[in-house]
Amino acid sequence: MKKISYFLPLLMTLIVIFSCNKALHLPTGSTPVKFTNTTYDSLATYDMLGKPSNLVMPRDSISPSLTSFIFDKLPKAADNFKAHPELFTSTSNATLNFTQKTDITITFVQETALYLSTVGFYTFQTNNPPTNPNQITNIKYIFPNCSALNSGGELVPGDKVDIGTYLPGTSMGFVLMENSYKPATHSIYTNGNHFCSADILNPENDPSIRRHVVILDYPTINPTLSLISFEDTDRSNPTNDNDFDDVTIYATQKVVN
């Protein structure tokens, strides 16, 4: 009996060690990414439902052709990760890269997200993209609550914000902070999931499913219009639909002299 009592704990220990080692080689689930070196700024004040006070008027008119372009590229509730693999290659762009001095406005298009999430941006030198969250020193909120009217927020299609002028050699990444807006306290929770343009900053353990941001260039010349669309939940979750149209905005890029 003594031999059995010594043997069982040893067996259990070996099973645990084997399981842990095996788990290290299986990229399942996700690991929280902490942005401990990041400061957060709002471009303007915002009301209790997270609508910013710096909306530019008149708002943009969302044309039927633009709406059709979005739905053709990213149909709702479809697995667009499988349907459009060309959008998710390692070389497909999820950032804006400025080669000339450029004015940027960001326009809200639509939202069908599960939560009240915040959309913001960060900048970096094009030749030095971020490789870890400590390199994201500042995130600026564009839409503190990027939720539509009658969907937990007050945004309507065409609402837009001027986010400034950027110089050549600068790049801009976007971030959706999942379930971050708290209307009861008029605050933004910064310790939850950040889904960023840079795949390496996202929480999924499997690198092949870390993409959360898709940028599509709409056929215009100057100003250039780039659609930015988000997948708003952890993609390692089996309930995730991979449609990448939970929140859609666009950036209008106007080259200035």
What positions do the PLM features span?
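Low-complexity, intrinsically disordered short peptide segments enriched in small/polar/basic residues
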Residues: 1, 12-14
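C-terminal motif of bacterial Sec signal peptides marking the signal peptidase cleavage site
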Residues: 16-19
